[in-house]
From Swiss-Prot:
May play a key role in the regulation of the intracellular concentration of adenosylhomocysteine. Its EC number is 3.13.2.1. NAD(+) binds at residues 203-205, 237, 266-271, 289, 324, 345-347, 390. It comes from the Bacteria. It comes from Synechococcus sp. (strain CC9902). PROSITE patterns: ADOHCYASE_1, ADOHCYASE_2. NCBIfam families: ahcY (TIGR00936), PRK05476.2-3 (NF004005). GO terms for biological process: L-homocysteine biosynthetic process; one-carbon metabolic process; S-adenosylmethionine cycle. It holds the Pfam family AdoHcyase. Binds 1 NAD(+) per subunit. This is Adenosylhomocysteinase. GO terms for molecular function: adenosylhomocysteinase activity. The keyword Kinase does not apply. It is found in: Cytoplasm.
Length: 476
């Protein structure tokens, strides 16, 4: 292990690592130790597989928010034998003390809170570059940026014109980073792609990208959709957002949520948790939805289902949770009331048309909180520049719910790494018995005791006594 330098500049120049401040490592380790007590699933996997080392030989390129909870995930992967390199999947989501704690133990980590887009793509490249000149054989992704980088870079090796017309600021920096890498090594991406056995994807947005590639025949390796494990989407997306959304709004603005008019755009699992979060603090919550089933669910829960255009001048708080593109556009932004709070809890920053605000007057209040003066003279408060508010303005989901998600991630990595030949170039989900196992590992921590089926009862409903108890198509 290389002796740890003391500044980000030294880290950039001297070691296989980029973090903000190694002096934060002790603080990060204290929080990491506390988080472990709230993450029983990951601790159980360490106990079960620690001696066996099922991930020995795995080289995992991780692109996922560099938080304290992620630090516990990283150390679990390493305990199970993996060699890991890590970057954050969002420019604002890194917790610098978490990155320092991981770096202090010798793991190559490339993550700083408040990265530029140029740095973000440089760091994402670094997780694909092993110090011995080798490549990763596994990707652990959140949002699909690492996977997408490898695939787009491979296309660019054959036809550089695919990088000619970036459609937004993010693509401008992405395309430039690929061109720079190709100038250094013209076959880097194809070699990397050939080495990868599989990818496990954490979030709704990244899963959508995987299914799109599968449909077009462009998916070059097997993928496991971790997001659609029940113990991920129905827990992380719902209960995690229920706690972390209002935490981030309160930290950023200190406003009283009670009595405010709030609009949640999108009523999937993330939207459901967000709506509960705001209602729980006393806001009057409305929902905007395109899906009639989700809209009916919202109405049956007592929310008003409205069109954004009809209420945009009435709302105090706007939250996007759709995974879609330009949901709140300039035509909506300019009509907002004075001091309206605007934020996003979907993965990417393009749910809100932040680019259309660049020519207006911006007044930075504090990191990730901006006052923007509209042509009307009204000011809006934009949080985290339209990126993930719960990680940009707070610390994300609590450790316990992330243990559910990350236990699925570890199981998915083991599955693909140890059984690579059993999977084709498609998107898969973990089998039901593993989903139930993840839930079972978390029950005792919160004092829950399962009832057991008798053999006669199990036979009556035609399930094994030990489960699984529901068919794959069951909707929880």
């Amino acid at each position: 292990m290389v002796a740890a330098p003391t500044t980000a500049t030294e880290l950039k120049l001297g070691t296989d690592c980029v973090i903000a401040d190694i002096n934060l490592a002790a603080f990060g380790r204290k929080e990491l130790d506390i988080a472990e007590t709230e993450m029983p699933g990951l601790m159980a996997l360490r106990a079960k597989y620690g001696n066996e080392k099922p991930l020995k030989g795995a080289r995992i390129a991780g692109s996922l928010h560099m938080t304290i909870q992620t630090a516990v995930l990283i150390e679990t992967l390493e305990e199970l034998g993996a060699d890991v390199r890590w970057a954050s999947c969002n420019i604002f989501s890194t917790q610098d003390h978490a990155a320092a704690a991981i770096a202090a133990n010798g793991t190559p980590v490339f993550a700083v809170k408040g990265e530029t887009l140029e740095e973000y793509w440089a760091y994402t490249h670094r997780i694909l570059e092993w110090s011995d000149g080798g490549a990763p054989n596994m990707i652990l992704d959140d949002g699909g940026d690492a996977t997408g980088l490898v695939i787009l870079g491979t296309k660019a090796e054959q036809d550089i014109t695919v990088l000619d017309n970036p459609s937004n600021e993010e693509e401008t920096f992405l395309f430039a980073s690929i061109k720079k890498k190709l100038a250094e090594d013209s076959s880097f991406y194809s070699r990397t792609k050939a080495a990868i056995q599989g990818v496990t994807e954490e979030t709704t947005t990244g899963v959508a990208r995987l299914y799109k590639m599968q449909k077009s025949g462009e998916l070059p390796f097997p993928a496991i959709n971790v997001n659609d494990s029940v113990t991920k989407s129905k827990f992380d997306n719902l209960y995690g957002c229920r706690e972390s959304l209002v935490d981030s709004i309160k930290r950023a603005t200190d406003v009283m949520v009670a009595g405010k008019q709030a609009l949640v755009v999108g009523y999937g699992d993330v939207g459901k948790g967000s709506a509960q979060s705001l209602r729980g603090l006393g806001a009057t919550v409305c929902i905007a939805e395109v899906d009639p089933i989700c809209a009916l669910q919202a109405a049956m829960e007592g929310y008003r289902v409205v069109r954004l255009d009809d209420v945009v001048d009435q709302m105090d708080i706007f939250v996007t949770a759709t995974g879609n593109y330009q949901v709140i556009r300039n035509e909506h932004l300019v009509k907002m009331k004075d001091e309206a709070i605007v934020c996003n809890i979907g993965h990417f920053d393009n749910e809100i048309d932040v680019a259309s605000l660049k020519d207006y007057k911006w007044d930075n209040i504090k990191p990730q909180v901006d006052h923007i003066t509209l042509p009307s003279g009204n000011k809006i408060i934009l949080l985290a520049e339209g990126r993930l508010v719960n990680l940009g303005c707070a610390t994300g989901h609590p450790s316990f719910v992330m243990s559910n998600s990350f236990t699925n991630q570890v199981l998915a990595q083991i599955e693909l790494f140890t059984k690579a030949n059993e999977y084709g170039k498609e998107v898969y989900v973990l089998p039901k018995h593993l989903d139930e196992m993840v839930a079972r590992l978390h029950l005792s921590k919160i004092g829950a005791n399962l009832t057991e089926l008798s053999k006669d009862q199990a036979d009556y409903i035609n399930v094994p006594v030990e489960g699984p108890y529901k068919p794959d198509h069951y909707r929880y």
